[in-house]
Swiss-Prot record:
The active site is at E49, D60. One of its GO terms (cellular component) is cytosol. Transmembrane segments: none annotated. This is Tryptophan synthase alpha chain. Belongs to the TrpA family.
Length: 272
């Protein structure tokens, strides 16, 4: 059983929803990334989604695009990101780490080389934004051979044919994009999300993680009633941006306060 499967299975047995924060590797400074990862776990993260900086992050909104720019100013590469995970694993062998990024840096390394290196570093899963499940059998086979879970994005407009492919090729969980548009979009329609998540559960047996548009405790509370996991990104990354010139302790504190808000809201929903 993979670390992701074990984590979600344990939480399900306790009737709890997973909290998965996202940060961009190397933002605001490469020296801070590993400490921020540990801090997120201390504040209730069940898994961590780590963004791999890439110069054309087409699915990301302005908040995460700026985070990517800050990381790229420090020349943070895919190899650096794997090194951060290796460092993180020296103190944390339990918390699953999911890499989220684009195909270009992986292709530059070679997908087979990347898959082996990622597994050796302690990565658990890869979400490749611009690689749909119908394409590149070889790439997904490389990930599978390295025992890396394959995470896919699905949205309210994803056709059933694509959902079937996600069910076949994906593992770990499916990432449901609860809003049309890019990351960091605003208004969530709870009834609409409930309807689409219900349809997802009819089409596949994988756990459902809900992301995009979860900005505060209220939205986390509503989404925790619907998903197996909640992913929060832009709300945290915007705090990093606002405090980018501060030292690591200040950034950890503001993230801790926001994480506590999310964790308490999710726990409240789980206990009702």
């Amino acid at each position: 059983m993979s670390r992701i499967d074990a984590t979600l299975s344990a939480l399900k047995s306790e009737k709890k929803t997973a909290l998965i924060p996202y940060i961009t590797a190397g933002d605001p400074h490469p020296d801070m990334t590993v400490n921020l990862m540990h801090s997120l776990v201390e504040q209730g993260a069940d898994m961590i989604e780590l963004g791999v900086p890439f110069s054309d992050p087409m699915a990301d909104g302005p908040v995460i695009q700026k985070a990517v720019e800050r990381a790229l100013e420090h020349n943070v590469s895919l190899k650096n990101v794997l090194a951060y995970v290796t460092e993180f694993r020296k103190k944390d062998a339990q918390t699953p780490v999911i890499l989220m990024g684009y195909l270009n840096p992986i292709e530059a390394m070679g997908s087979d080389v990347f898959a082996k290196a990622a597994a050796e570093a302690g990565v658990d899963a890869v979400l490749t934004v611009d690689m749909p499940p119908e394409e590149s059998e070889g790439y997904f086979q490389d990930l599978s051979l390295a025992q890396l879970d394959r995470i896919f994005l699905v949205s309210p407009t994803t056709p059933d044919g694509r959902l079937n492919a996600v069910s076949e090729k994906g593992s770990g969980f499916v990432y449901y994009v609860s809003l049309k548009g890019v990351t960091g979009s605003k208004a969530l329609d709870v009834d609409d999300v409930a309807q689409h998540v219900g349809h997802l559960r009819e089409k596949m047996s994988m756990p459902v993680a809900i992301g995009f548009g979860i900005r505060d405790g209220n939205t986390a509370y509503e989404m925790a009633k619907l998903g197996d996991a909640i992913i929060v990104g832009s709300a945290l990354v915007s705090l990093i941006e606002q405090n980018a010139s501060e030292d690591s302790a200040v950034i950890q504190q503001v993230l801790s306060d926001k994480m506590r808000e999310f964790r308490q809201a999710i726990d409240k929903a789980d206990n009702e």
